[in-house]
């Protein structure tokens, strides 16, 4: 561990002159610059210029960025307390960079929302990854669970106004099991890598496997079980991936009430999924996911569910891309519990830092139609989203 004099030298040299790099100036289609779609924004890069030997050895880099996503929505579903309104969907700030060339770090915060337990400003990403070898990288901290193709995507790159129901309910953006909002993330360690380079430079095979607490973000482990999550996919062509994912885990109910017969102490998360993605100027993305495990807040709810979706994105002009999605979720893994969303979205990119999005969704909710007290089951939703990033 560094002595106090070395730490002081690092602090002082970090305050030395910083050079801010401008945004990238790639003039290709706005999304073409972001091949790693869990990356948030181009950001601003700061490089430390110092004669201190410790700093020269570390070669630290810092990048700062963030985005604001505002939304207005309207729904014609009857019987609801509101038909829509304005919403600040995301305000996120991040810092990332490298030290010693091979160690990548990232800290990301979500700073919108009303303060409260698991609400309001909070850390969403906080990890370090050793990246010396493409074939073997090790990540430690709080980050996205390695389940599903869509889960790692930034909200900026999904293409529609929301994630699919499969990603929301089963890949744990907003997990059906009753976990607090964790945005598809957990605390743990993951090993991943890319193997067998092709002639065009892309790798034929990707693997990832991780051990996680199973309690979501910003929560410590409270049981003796660790979640095992992994994925494996094959890339026969550049930008095309075909593969599958598995999850063997358990969630322990932190709000368990022994006096409530419907409250469960824990629920297992045994899940698998398979799908494909193609990301370039055109987008094709589809997955099927299946889950075994109940809902900790209500033991009477089904313990088996599944979901699937198909997304197609078509560039219609240099700065305009249109997406369509067929999106299904069955909470009881029966056709009577099917919720089907048919979505259409237009994305306009004004430069690299402004995104205007118009989304339309028609929902056919069989579970609402067949409930003991039926509610409106066929309805339309329109929303407009504007994102500014830096």
Which residues does each predicted region cover?
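N-terminal periplasmic/intermembrane-space "pro-region" immediately following the signal or transit peptide
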Residues: 2-69, 390
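Outer-membrane beta-barrel "beta-signal"
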Residues: 348, 362, 376-390
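Detector for outer-membrane/organellar transmembrane beta-barrel domains
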Residues: 42, 57, 233-332
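Transmembrane beta-barrel architecture of outer membranes
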Residues: 88-90, 121-125, 186-188, 225-231, ...
């Amino acid at each position: 561990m560094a002595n106090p004099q070395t730490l002081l030298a690092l602090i002082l040299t970090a305050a030395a002159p910083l050079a801010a790099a401008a945004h990238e100036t790639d003039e290709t289609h706005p999304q073409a610059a972001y091949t790693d779609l869990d990356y948030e924004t181009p950001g601003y890069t700061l490089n430390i210029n110092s004669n201190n030997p410790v700093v020269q050895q570390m070669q630290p880099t810092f990048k700062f960025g963030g985005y604001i996503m505002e939304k207005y929505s309207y729904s014609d579903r009857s019987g609801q307390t509101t038909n829509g309104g304005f919403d600040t969907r995301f305000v996120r700030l991040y810092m990332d960079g490298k030290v010693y060339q091979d160690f990548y770090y990232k800290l990301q915060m979500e700073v919108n929302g009303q303060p409260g337990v698991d609400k309001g400003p909070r850390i969403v990403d906080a990890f370090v990854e050793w990246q010396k070898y493409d074939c073997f990288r090790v990540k430690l901290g709080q980050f996205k669970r390695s389940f599903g193709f869509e889960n790692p995507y930034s909200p900026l790159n999904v293409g529609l106004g929301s994630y699919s129901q499969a990603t929301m309910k089963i890949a744990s953006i907003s997990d059906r099991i009753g976990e607090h909002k964790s945005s598809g993330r957990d605390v743990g360690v993951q090993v991943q890598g890319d193997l067998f380079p092709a002639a065009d430079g892309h790798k034929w095979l990707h693997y990832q496997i991780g051990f996680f607490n199973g309690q979501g973000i910003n929560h410590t482990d409270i049981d003796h079980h660790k979640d095992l999550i992994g994925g494996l996919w094959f890339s026969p062509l550049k930008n095309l991936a075909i593969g599958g994912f598995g999850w063997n885990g358990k969630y322990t109910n932190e709000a368990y009430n022994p006096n409530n017969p419907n409250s469960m102490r824990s629920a297992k998360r045994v899940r698998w999924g398979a799908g494909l993605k193609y990301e370039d100027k055109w987008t094709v993305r589809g997955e099927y996911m299946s889950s075994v495990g109940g809902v900790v807040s209500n033991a009477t709810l089904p313990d088996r569910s599944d979901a699937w979706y198909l997304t197609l994105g078509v560039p219609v002009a240099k700065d305009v891309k249109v997406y369509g999605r067929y999106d299904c979720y069955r909470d009881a893994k029966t056709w009577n519990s099917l919720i089907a969303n048919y979505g259409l979205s237009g994305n306009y990119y004004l430069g690299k830092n402004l995104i205007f999005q118009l989304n339309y969704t028609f929902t056919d909710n069989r579970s609402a139609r067949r409930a003991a007290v039926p509610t409106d089951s066929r309805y339309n939703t329109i929303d407009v989203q504007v994102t500014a990033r830096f």
